[in-house]
Amino acid sequence: CDHHVPDDVLPPAVAILNAKRLDNTYPYTHLSGCGVGFKFMQAFAISNGIEFHHLIPLLDLVAVSIASDIVPIMGENRILAYYGLERLNRMPSSGLHSIIKICGLDKHNITIDDIVFKIGPRINAAGRMRMDEHDENAAPSGGHAAVNLLIEGNDKQAQEFCSIIDA
């Protein structure tokens, strides 16, 4: 999933999800990468009889993606950001809750600016950190720790991943 304009020649793949592809038929072309993934999951849910409420816990991540990717907050992004911020302020995922605490933010009053200037940079910086790829027993670091943080459901484990990316 991506939100950047793709190259003229696409790499071989089973699927390339990108709202800016020349052959795209989706009406809104400014979705963030995570927004594209969310819409894919929404279509999958509809096609497979899965109720939408199962996707609601993911909206906080979508809001973080919209703000961090600096995509226009209009149209569908505005709607996803609104409900994502609502989720982030009410019941954030364990990983985002840990980042909110590390940033010293009021967990019930997170704004898009907080994501752009405090939360997003921590996640993005972690993705640029290197880990020892030859040591399979090494603790996750860098991008691996950031991904693990964002998908972690256990608060204590999320705090450990958060301390790795905040180091």
Residue ranges and their predicted role:
Residues 1-3, 68:
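Active-site flanking residues adjacent to catalytic metal/cofactor-binding acidic residues
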Residues 9-11, 141:
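Histidine/acidic-residue-rich catalytic or RNA/ligand-binding cores of hydrolases
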Residues 8-9, 72:
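Proline-centered turn/helix-capping motifs that create local helix->coil transitions or kinks
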